[in-house]
Each structure stands twice: as C-alpha cells, then as structure tokens.
Amino acid sequence: MKILSAEQIRELDKYTIEHEPVASIVLMERAANKLTTTLTDGYIRKNDNIIIICGMGNNGGDGLAIARLLIQQGFLHVSAYIVRHAVQGSDDFEANEIRLKNIGGFRYIETEMQIPPIPADAVVIDALFGSGLNRAAEGISAQVIRAINQSGAVVFSVDVPSGLYCDKPNSETDAIIKADVTFTFHAPKLCFMFPNNGQYVGWFRVLDIGLSKDFSNSQTTRYSYITQQTIDSIIKTRGKFSHKGTYGHALVCAGSYGKVGAAVLSVGAALRSGAGLVSTLVPDCGYEIMQSSCPEAMVHTQADKEQDELFNVEVKRNKGHLSLGYIHHLDLNKFSSIGVGPGIGTEKDSFEFLESLFRKYNKPMVIDADALNIIAEHDKIKAMIPKGSILTPHPGEFKRLVGEWSDDLDKLELQARFAKKHGVVVVLKGAHTSVATPEGYIYFNSTGNPGMAKGGSGDVLTGVLTALLAQGYTPARAAAIGVYIHGAAGDLAAEQQSQTGIIASDIIANLPKAFKQFE
C-alpha cells in the first residue's frame, strides 16, 4: 500500500472526482457515511455526549456531515461547533453547513469565551484540520485544540489529528490534537509512522472510500505500508515435490556465556520459519543447551586441537565466546544464509570472529545486536559488510551506527542513506518497523504490538529473516515478509495471553499460525 504525500492526496481526490466521475460533495458524503458507520459500530453509543469540532475546509465539511448523519440516526446529544479560523469556508463545507442548519444547527467559536465546556465523559470528533495543513495551528484554533487535550474526553480524529503535518515533523510547541483513534482515508499518512507522533495519532484505522486505485498505483513514492495483501503477493508456496534442499540451509552464529538463550531463540525462530536445514554455531558453553533445546538443529562449536593442526592454524581457545577457533574449520559456502550477532558480545575475540566471517562469506547475511555494535566501533569492518545483507538495529544500535538525528524524518533519511551507501537493507525495529532498501525505498510494517518490546524479540526476528534468506527470497522481500510475520506472531500471542505477559518464546510458538494465513 503506497503512502502518498499531501499533494498526491489532493490530486487523488481530484482524479477520482473527474474520472469516476463523482461530484466532490458526493465524495464528501461517501467519506462521512463510511466514518459514521465505523463510529457507530462499537465506538460511540446513542446516549453519548458527542461534541464535533469542525474547521472551515473539507475536513470541517466531513465533520458537519457526520453530525447530520448521527442526528438522523437518532443520536440524542450531538453538538456541532465551527471554529471561525477563516473568512470563508470551502464550497463543500458551506453546502454541508446549510444541510446541518436545516435539521439541527451548530454554533460558531470565534473567541476563547465561546469554547464550550468539554466534560471528561464526552466524545469529541475532531474535524478541524485535515491532511492539507501546511502551517501551525494558531489563534482560536490552537486554543480549541488545547482545550480538547486538557478535557480528558475520548477523541476521534477525522483523517489526521488537527495540527499535525502530513509529510513532515512538527515543532514541539505546535498545538496538536491528541487523538485516541484516528480514522484516516485511503491509506496511512507518513506522519503516522513517526514515533514522536504516537501521542497524537493514537491507534489508527484506514477507511476505504473508493478513491481511484489506478491513480494511487501510478504514483511514485518512496514510502509504502506492508499489509497482508503485500505479503500475499510475494510469499512463495511450498511445492509438492520439494525437499529440504529446496528451502536452503541457514546458519545462526549466536550466544556467549550467560547469553546462550539468544541463540536458542534465534535458532528456534529459524526452525519455525521454513528453512530446510538449520545449523548453529555457538560457544562451547552452549553446546549441551542447544542440543537439548533445539533437537532439529545441527550444532557446531569450537574446532578441537587436531582440527587446528589439520588447518595449520594456531588460535586462542575460548569456551565462552565465538572466536577465530570457531570458524576456520567450517565450509561456510554450504550455507544458504547466515545470521550473526545475538548475544555474541563485543570482546576482541568477537570482533576477530566477525571480521573473519565477513572475509570468508560474501552472500547476504542477517546482522543484529552485538554484531552491529562491533561494526559501529570499527569503520574497517563496516566496509566489509556483504552486499545485500539485512541489518536489524533497534534505535540505540542505529544511533551508534549513524550518530544523532534531529527528528523522525531525519532518522529515516539517515536510514535510507546508510542502506544506499553500503548496499544493504536496514530494518529499524520499533512500532511500524521501517525497512530501507539500497534503492531508496522505505516500507513500514503494519503488525506488532507494545507487548513485543521485551528482551529476545529481536533475536527471534534474526532467526526468521535468516530462514527466509535461506529460502531464496531477495533481501528486501525477506525483510518485508520477516517483519510482517514476526509482528503477526506477536499479535497472535498477545491476543491469546496479553501484551504484558507475552515473551519472545511466545512469538516463536505463534510463527506457524502467522505463516498459515498465507497457505
């Protein structure tokens, strides 16, 4: 699903009006009907005190139409207010102003004294400003926004929380509605993906109001939203006559003394994500744990002294961390993909291991956790990252890789720049995890929940991605499928248990169910 700019959204409306064809006032009525139907399906009740705050543009026209429809449906306490922030409203706004006046009326807000009391048990429908806003709310509009935010009432925003820019970050001092739910039309807006805007957008729902899909699909944009339909179009089905060799051999390099659990989680996730064979390379201290925890995986550890002599190498032996002694005897080319980093530590031995791994293996890898921290500390090894690799930092790890950023949009630019410079896919983990490709595209994930913000969740993602790479997916597609499936499994776990109570192992347990929806 493409994420369009405010200008593209205006052109989309215009194209739909001209080519459907449909009158703009009819399109506004369609949007109001859709939103009203959604609101009455569990969000509001007939006896609620509903306060609708309208601007004088088309967003305000939507609000006036919603007020009229609710009154016509028998809602008992609907009050509509028009904030006089302009001399004249849009044509469709004025048409709906007349329609509402004929059945119920409204009041104007021109001064602070005219702002109505907003009880904490009221429901506010925010239709003040829409996606076309290009300057900060000020004057009476800002005063109304602050009054709504201070009221404690439940707030539902129409299309975009009023005061929020569609395509760029706001200033910290801007007056912006803090919505509980935002009902947006056609597709999410870029601003919904910014972490700093979570306090304003709340949860959002996308409503289809029949805007032209042909026009939307023809638009060029670097931003997209990963949905179930996206994954359904790119995920492969397993062939009747396929065998384990068809689905690749994944190797997970993970764990250290006290952190073998990271390896258990990554390997367990890889086993549940479709790879034909899964091997793991762990320190000696993790051998028995891995053998008993993941019997389906093949476990490799440190070369013995005879192997050292056979390969004519002399290495320091380390039972607690991966080091050079763990890699020289392995034929890495037999692996279809390698995932590295969870729990390996950042000691000198770990650095030498990672450097040697990058020298010996030139296929795309999944690079996470401590491997990213090692890369951040050594420019030499940063230049050695195999092209096409998938890097999976959380914000702290990403900051160590690229430095500080000024705002959420700047962070996305740094993510895209790093992906292009190094020829890698960067998966920046968090709410609406973003996937940046070397070609400059950025995809945002639609699945996942705050319950997944716990230790081990990232290790699970590493295993999922490594398994998908092993199956022959391109790095970009592996990343898109991986973050979606990972989040979907977390959603299933939270639904069965709770966001508070789920742990990383619960995500692994639900991976098969997440994949099942595509079979």
Which ranges hold each PLM region?
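Short gly/ser/thr-rich secondary-structure transition/capping motifs
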Residues: 105-112, 138, 163-167, 231-236, ...
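Small/polar-residue-rich loop-to-helix segments that shape phosphate-bearing ligand pockets
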Residues: 96-97, 122-127, 333-342
